[in-house]
Amino acid sequence: MPARFDCFVTGTDTEIGKTLVSAVLLTRLADAGYRAAGLKPIAAGTLAGAPTRTNEDVEQLRAAASVNLPFDTVCPWLLDAPMSPHLAAAREGVTITLPPILDAFAHARSLADAVVVEGVGGFRVPLSDDFDTAEMAVALGLPVVLVVGLRLGCLNHAALTAEAIAARGLHLAGWVGNVVDPSMAGLDDNVATLRRWINAPHLGTIPRLPHADARLAAAHVDIAPLLARTAETRR
């Protein structure tokens, strides 16, 4: 049986590839023999015209997972409006709270060897007036995988996010670069700078793909450093 592996995926911003990287991790874990489950506890924006109320990111995670979980477990908080979760929740007259998220994680963990939990937006996105994504990550207490959207400004965003993760006592287990702007000047030099600045393994850089395909992207990501640390922790 594989050693237990769980992680929390966050990013330097919104729309920088967290869902793609989460799906890549699930794909790689399943290939390594794990029963892998994905959670996106909070999703803002429902698919227009879908036969049932759902979210595109949630469906990508469900497709990549090797453990089939009920939708409400994968995403206990689904909001209609594609905006900051605290604003979307206020529009619907609800308040996002932590217990349903922790319950969903516990349920997923009971059925899987590995659970990948994807955050929403960046690391400090508000979830309510007094609760944000960072606090959700702390409550889960998982090692963090950081997705860096490679575009102008990524060095500052990555450094600030890595500092915020460390300041909360969380372990940054690795980071993945995702090319958001293929015309970015000095892209390779920026990646080299990130490798020096971020005190965590660089798991890979995903080039700009024709479409967000987890199997194609998985060829550019190595999860061995994540699994090696898990094995060391169990010794």
From Swiss-Prot:
The catalysed reaction is: (7R,8S)-7,8-diammoniononanoate + CO2 + ATP = (4R,5S)-dethiobiotin + ADP + phosphate + 3 H(+)
Task: Enumerate the Pfam families for this protein.
Answer: AAA_26
> Which pathway does the protein contribute to?
Cofactor biosynthesis; biotin biosynthesis; biotin from 7,8-diaminononanoate: step 1/2
Which residues does Mg(2+) bind? 19, 57, 118
Question: Could you tell me which Gene3D superfamilies the record lists for this protein?
Answer: P-loop containing nucleotide triphosphate hydrolases
Which UniProt key words apply to this protein?
A: ATP-binding, Biotin biosynthesis, Cytoplasm, Ligase, Magnesium, Metal-binding, Nucleotide-binding
In its UniProt record, a GO molecular function of this protein is: magnesium ion binding
Cofactor list:
Mg(2+)
For whether the record's keyword set contains Hydrolase, the answer is no
Q: Where along the chain is ATP bound?
A: 15-20, 57, 118-121, 207-209
GO biological process terms, semicolon-separated: biotin biosynthetic process
List, alphabetically, the InterPro entries matched.
DTB_synth_BioD (IPR004472), P-loop_NTPase (IPR027417)
Family classification: Belongs to the dethiobiotin synthetase family.
Q: How does it assemble?
A: Homodimer.
Role summary: Catalyzes a mechanistically unusual reaction, the ATP-dependent insertion of CO2 between the N7 and N8 nitrogen atoms of 7,8-diaminopelargonic acid (DAPA, also called 7,8-diammoniononanoate) to form a ureido ring.
Descriptive protein name: ATP-dependent dethiobiotin synthetase BioD
Species for this entry: Ralstonia pickettii (strain 12J)
The gene for this chain is bioD
